[in-house]
C-alpha cells in the first residue's frame, strides 16, 4: 500500500508537469505543490466567513480558498459557522464586522481596499477594510500557498492609490483597437455578448492583482453603447464582475447628444445637453448602481470635444463630473490632446509640449471627482520617453498615470517585452517640483500635492484568445501592472519571479531562465527598434508594428526625428529649440537643457546633434545605432535558446506556443536590425566600423537566383528588403521557382528563408536541396494566432523568416524554392541564408 501511494504521488507530480494548459487560468492555476500529510495537517482545514452575502466579495473569497486548497494541496476546506476563536480555520471578514463581533484587535490603520493578513500555521485571519479588501487578502494568502510559502506572517497592506483601473479599447462590432489577443469578450455585432463566463474569469484575474475597475469600451467611443438594450447589457457585465469587487466604467463620445440624442448641439454649457447627459447617467446607474464612472477622450485625433464650441477642456470634463457626483462616480479625462497637423518646417513646433499647453492653465478648474489621465511620456507609449512634464504642472488637480499593457508600439505581443523596467523609469523619476522630492508615483497617489483622488490606468485589451493577450509571457505585464498599482516600490524582478512561480511552477531553472529572458527583453527591443530617445522607429502611419523610420517625419503627427544626411534628433531646449525642457521644474530642466548632462538614452529626444557626435560612451551616434541593433537581434536569438532549455519542464502546449513566438521574434529582429541600419547608412553614408551593415556573406539574394515564374519587385520602403528588391510570382495564380547552385563549402548548415507573409492569402513554399525536400510552409500568420496588425504589402510588417536547422549540403548542390501564390499573396521571397549552426547573420 505504501508503495502504491508513492507511485500515485510520483504519477501525480509527473502529470502536473506535463498536463496541457492553454493559459486561460493565467497565474491562478492553483497547481499542486509538494505538501505531505504532516505538512497538510499543519495548515487550516476549515474556512469561516463573517457576513458573507450571496455574490459578495467575501463569499467569493471563501469559494476561491476552497478551490485553491483543493487544487494546490488536495485539501477539502469545510465551512464552519463564525466564531471568534477560529483555530484550524481561515477566517475572512471585514475589520469593522470582526471588531463588532469579537474583541478589538491591534491592526494598523487600513485605507479602503486594504487588508490585514495573519498566518500562524493552521490558523489564518484575513481582515479587510471592506469586503473587497478581504477578497484581496484571500488571494494574497492563496498566492503564498501556491508558491509553497507556509511561513508565519502578520502584516497590513493598503493600496498606493484609490484608482487602479484597466481600460479596454473594445468596439461595439467586437473588434479591439490595438488588441492582439482575439475579439472582444464584451461586444459583438453592435451589442453586449450573451456569454459572461470570460468576463467573470477576467474579473477574477483582475481582482487577484487588486484592480478595482475596468472601462469596457474604446476611448474612441460609439454612442450606441448608450442605447437602452446596451445599458441592460452593461448591467450583465457589471453583475459578472461584482462578486470580484471589480466595478465597470464606460468611455463616452462627446458628441452623443447630437449623434444619438437628436439634439442640434453637444455644447457642454448648453442646458439641453447638460440635461441629456444627466438623464443618460441616471439611466446607467439604474442598470449599474455601482458604476465606477466615465472615461473621456476629447479634442484628440478626430474625436469631438468642447473646443468645437470654444469651451475649455475643464468645462467639458465638468459636464460629466457633475452628472456623476450624485452617485460617487469618477470622471477620467485623458490628457492625450494634441494637434495632429503640425508643420515640421517650424523649428519650434513640438507635439510633446501639447499636454502642458492644454492643461496647465486649467489647474484647479476641474471638479473634485475629475482625474486627468496622463500617458507616462509626452508622445505615445514609445520604447523610451522622458517623464511627461504634466505631472509636475497640476498642483490642484487629481492625476493618474496611463500605461499600456497592450504592446502597441512594442511588438504587439509577438515580441517578448517585459514592461515594468520601462514603467519604473517614469514612476521612480523625481520631478523636483519646488525643489522638493516629487516622485511621479507620489504625485499620482495624491501624496505630493495633498490630493484625495488619483492613481493608475492601463490599456490592456485582452480578447477571446485563451492566453488573453495572445502570448503566455505577455501576461507577466498585466500581473506586474496590478502589483505596481498597489505597491510601486516593488522590484520588477521580484514581481516577475512571483508571476513565474504562479504561472509555470517552482522549478528554479524555469524561474531563473524566464526572469533572465524577461529582464533582458526591453533593452533588447529598444536596441533593435529605436535608440537614444529617438522613439520606436515603427510605421506610425500604418500598423505601429514593423520598421519604417521614414514615417516619423514629413507629416503633421509630430513624432519627428529631424534626421538628415548630417544630423538627427529634436532640439527641445529653451536656448535654441522648441522650449520643451522649460516645461519641467528647474532642476530637471537644467539637466535636459545641457547636452553634456543629458543621459545618452534620451539624447536624441532633447538635442539635435551630428551623426558623428560622441556619446558619453565614447561611441558616435551612428555607430551606437549600428552596434545596438546588432546586439538587440543577438539577444532576441538568445531567447530561443534559453526557452528551448525549458523543454520538458513546461507543459507541451504552452512550451510550443511560446517557442513559436520567440522563433518569430528572432527572425523579425533581423528584419528590424537590417531595416534601421540600412536606412540610416543610406541616409548618412557613414559605414559601420565593424563592417557588418550591408555586408552579408552568407546570403543569397532571391533576385540573383535563376527565376521561372518569378519576377523581381522593388520593395517600398526600400530598407524592408535585403537588397531593396524581392521576387514575386508573375501573377497571383501561378507558381514560381527560384534556383541556385550552392557555392558554400560542404557541411551542415541552418538554412533561413526571409519572405513576406501578407494579409489576404496563404502562399505555399517548398525548399529543396539537391533531390531532397527540406521543408514546406504556408504564409498563414493571420490564421496562426500571431495577432499583430497585418499588412497587405511587402514591408517591414509582413517580412519574416523561417529557419531549417541542421541541413546537410554539398558544394554544387542545387537549392530550389517553389512558391505557389494564393489570394493577394504572390509567394514573395527576399533572400536565403546559409549559416553555420548557431551563427546569427
Curated annotation (Swiss-Prot):
Gene Ontology cellular component list: extracellular region
EC number: 3.2.1.139
BP term (GO), one: xylan catabolic process
Catalyzed reactions per annotation: an alpha-D-glucuronoside + H2O = D-glucuronate + an alcohol
Domain of life of the source: Eukaryota
InterPro entries for the chain: A-glucoronidase_C_sf, Glyco_hydro_67_aGlcAse, Glyco_hydro_67_aGlcAse_N, Glyco_hydro_67_C, Glyco_hydro_67_cat, Glycoside_hydrolase_SF, Hex-like_dom2
Induction text: Expressed in the presence of D-xylose and L-arabinose and at very low level in the presence of D-glucuronic acid. Expression is under the control of the xylanolytic transcriptional activator xlnR and the carbon catabolite repressor creA.
Alphabetically ordered keywords of this record: Carbohydrate metabolism, Glycoprotein, Glycosidase, Hydrolase, Polysaccharide degradation, Secreted, Signal, Xylan degradation
An MF annotation (GO) of this entry: alpha-glucuronidase activity
Signal peptide interval: 1-20
Entry's localization field: Secreted
UniProt keyword annotation of Glycoprotein present: yes
Glycosylation sites: 51, 76, 85, 149, 222, 279, 310, 343, 450, 465, 527, 576, 682, 723, 732
Family in the record: Belongs to the glycosyl hydrolase 67 family.
Role, per record: Alpha-glucuronidase involved in the hydrolysis of xylan, a major structural heterogeneous polysaccharide found in plant biomass representing the second most abundant polysaccharide in the biosphere, after cellulose. Releases 4-O-methylglucuronic acid from xylan.
Name by which UniProt lists this protein: Probable alpha-glucuronidase A
